[in-house]
């Protein structure tokens, strides 16, 4: 099941005991999923949702809280409609429901944001407002670089009201207009997790957090692997360059090179990929890596001084781009 469907399924099964919170959820769900229509001179309230369990929850809450019967119509997938949709409709008592839920103000005008009783309600009402909005038009993407919890809104006023509700819950949300559509977006991973819990989707939050953690572990492992590969490549290039310089040093010095420096140099040339520690173990008698490094450093220094005196290419001349490319 996709993350969005998981959240909506869990929220639809959530038991809410507070009447005020249940009213706030219904008002928000109707505002974000529905609309007011005039049919034969009467106000009809409709809400279109994408899961049957949401439609059944809304129908039950409308009856339990307000005593009005709602009818659920199923719109089967066909043509441009990819998925089955569910329309919850209250026709006979539409105007009364619209007034009681705050969709219409005292003068009978449509409310553009969220009803005043929801905006000025308790923290539990703010949680319920988000729950209703998410059930109506929410989405949650998989954890990742572009993960987001998002709600499509019927207008900028509703979007700003939802941002305000999030602020009351300690969550930073932003209102955006995307391709002519008003949306409220939460992108921070911690904020997404907190909001899921606030809405009542704790189980889905745990699943989302687990996937997020797994992704972060994989990303860290990949970074470390790339880092290790880069280090290995650098080490290999450095070893090849050192061997080439030592080879040139032995050519420059010829028979004048001291035996102990020549022995260290030959080890470097014969074991080009070995570390200094490994070269020390191969020496006879064995040496520390610092001793090996010191002898090779003195060998190169002697050779470069002689090359400068004689005006011939020094040890650095042996390190060519082609040599490093092949490393």
Swiss-Prot record:
Coiled coil: none annotated. Residues 275-308 bind DNA. Keywords: Cell cycle, Cell division, DNA-binding. One of its GO terms (biological process) is cell division. Signal peptide: none annotated. InterPro entries: Homing_endonucl (IPR027434), Sporu_reg_WhiA_N_dom (IPR018478), Sporulation_regulator_WhiA (IPR003802), Sporulation_regulator_WhiA_C (IPR023054), WhiA_LAGLIDADG_dom (IPR039518). One of its GO terms (molecular function) is DNA binding. HAMAP family: HTH_type_WhiA. Belongs to the WhiA family. Involved in cell division and chromosome segregation. This is Probable cell division protein WhiA. The gene is whiA.
